[in-house]
Amino acid sequence: KAKMPRFKKFLSDSTGVVPRTIWHYDDAGHTQEATQTLRQVVDEEDLATPKPRRVIEKRLQLASNKNSIILDSFAGSGTTAHAVLKLNATDGGNRRFILCEMMDYAETITAERVRRVMNGYGEGTKAVAGLGGGFDYYTVGEPLFLPDKNLNESVGAAAIRAYVAYTESIP
């Protein structure tokens, strides 16, 4: 039986971050730290379980590059945006983020946290310099369908016609 030569790659030759199966809290943070950070930035602690910024940073280091677009469809307190901005400031990256949040705190907590992280927050010895950047905030209109699955007539005939035209043109 003929033997085939194989390329052997050693861990010491690898570049970048090598993932480990366990992330200790001193590397990745914990929920108490996440709650403290949220309180420092927007003076809010009512969110049940904010994610630690450092754990999101570690995920981004492993699964993205410096020009990635990061989507967080359950943005909560805005931790993902905070992590993206912090990582960009650290490594000179140009990552961008898209956050989606449907709860009523989207503007008062999520967007406000992002604004403060970009512009700076705190006072005196507790002042934290802004990380820079910018973002756009959008509000989606009324839902086309009501919870009972009927059409929401208050959106107007034009929106309903556009929806019908769109769905009828899908093959």
Question: What are the residue ranges of the model-derived segments?
Answer:
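Class I S-adenosyl-L-methionine
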Residues: 1-69, 96
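SAM-dependent methyltransferase catalytic region
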Residues: 114-171
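A structural signal for well-ordered alpha-helical scaffolds and beta->alpha junctions
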Residues: 16, 107, 111, 153-157
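Residue-level detector of flexible, active-site-proximal loop/helix-junction positions
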Residues: 29-30, 104, 144
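Residues immediately flanking
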Residues: 25, 102, 142
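A glycine-rich phosphate-binding loop feature that marks nucleotide/adenosyl-phosphate handling sites
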Residues: 5, 11, 76-77, 130-136, ...
